[in-house]
Swiss-Prot record:
Keyword terms of this UniProt record: Cell membrane, Membrane, Repeat, Transmembrane, Transmembrane helix, Transport
Positions of the EamA domain: 18-141, 161-287
Upper lineage: Bacteria, Bacillati, Bacillota, Bacilli, Bacillales
Membrane-topology annotation of the record: Multi-pass membrane protein
Protein's UniProt keywords contain Cytoplasm: no
Pfam families, alphabetized: EamA
Parts of the chain that traverse the membrane: 11-31, 37-57, 70-90, 97-117, 126-146, 148-168, 180-200, 217-237, 244-264, 265-285
Recorded coiled-coil stretches: none
Biological source species: Bacillus subtilis (strain 168)
The family this protein is said to belong to: Belongs to the EamA transporter family.
Gene: yvbV
Domain of life, source organism: Bacteria
Localisation: Cell membrane
Protein name, as recorded: Uncharacterized transporter YvbV
Length: 305
């Protein structure tokens, strides 16, 4: 895929961080009208089916007989566990606080990439990892005093771990599958597991099909999930993966501000301090070592010759 023009890259990045930022308060508000697993299953199913339609012209790249295990594992980690745990967890914690813990994911991904992908671990990255753990500890500390739900914190961490594992798994296996089919099928397959779990443990009749719920459901399904993931893979495919990673810290910031304005969630000192540590951590984890920078310069010079 060709490198995108700077203006288009900036617009796509802005769209992505805004959509994924407002997703948290919107999801929190929608849970007043629906049980969590059914809500997670319905929104991911709609998003997945929309992307299947987009992917159909690339049906020759599917190769389902050879690649179905990749789609299955990715669906379980990135969709069933990630969306399932986060949607249940939003019942226990404010949306802004929950998103701040979930976006500890880039830090966890740094650890898992080092362990399983052999990616380098240098001083700045180690400092970033330590700050990230400290940030989650600061945010979570109030839970041990009874101020916030420990269950909610654990669900947020579980969501972050499943997303980090899923992302590392996609990095390891991504070259063997088509990126659009990967996200379309992982959403569709993952949604089936969520809906089965929802039908088993929840009641479909408990969903209140009100205008606010339908509006939130469609907005999240279309803009946050379907278009959000399409934009994500467009940016990654054009060589902007590092930019996407470095801008992820804006997502919990937008979530916290939006949750404070629309859901009247409090901005506590521990939340702001923990978020600052996590933001700093993400920035440090996404910095490149001198060797990586030198290698990148060498590649660019060769390309220019």
């Amino acid at each position: 895929m060709k490198q995108l023009p700077k203006t288009r890259t900036a617009l796509l990045l802005a769209f992505l961080v805004i959509m994924w930022g407002v997703n948290w308060p919107l999801s929190k508000a929608a849970l007043a009208y629906s049980p969590p697993l059914l809500f997670a299953g319905i929104r991911t199913l709609i998003g997945g089916l929309l992307l299947v339609i987009v992917a159909l012209p690339r049906i020759h790249k599917l190769r389902l007989k050879e690649t179905w295990p990749i789609y299955l594992v990715s669906a379980l980690l990135n969709i069933t566990l990630f969306y399932g745990l986060q949607t249940i967890g939003l019942n226990y914690l404010p949306a802004g606080l929950f998103s701040a813990i979930v976006f500890f994911q880039p830090v966890l991904m740094g650890v898992f990439s080092w362990l399983w992908l052999g990616e380098s671990m240098f001083v700045m990255k180690v400092i970033g990892l330590i700050l990230g753990f400290a940030g989650v500890a600061v945010i979570s500390a109030a839970g041990f005093g009874g101020h916030i739900s420990v269950i909610g914190v654990l669900l947020a961490l579980g969501s972050a771990v499943s997303w980090a594992l899923g992302t590392v798994y996609m990095k390891k296996t991504g070259s063997r599958v088509d990126s659009i089919w990967m996200v379309a099928l992982q959403l569709t397959i993952g949604s089936v597991f969520l809906l089965i779990s929802g039908f088993w443990t929840e009641s479909f009749s408990a969903i209140q099909w009100t205008a606010p719920f339908i509006t939130s459901l469609l907005f999240i399904s279309v803009f946050v999930i379907a278009l959000g993931w399409l934009v994500f893979f467009t940016l990654v495919g054009s060589g902007e993966a590092s930019k996407v990673a470095s801008y992820t810290f804006l997502i919990p910031l937008i979530s916290i501000v939006a949750s404070s304005i629309f859901l009247h969630e409090p901005l506590t000192l521990s939340l702001l301090a923990g978020l600052l540590l996590i933001v700093t951590s993400i920035c440090l984890v996404n910095t490149k070592s001198k060797a990586q920078k030198a290698a990148a310069i060498g590649i660019n010079e060769k390309a220019a010759q």
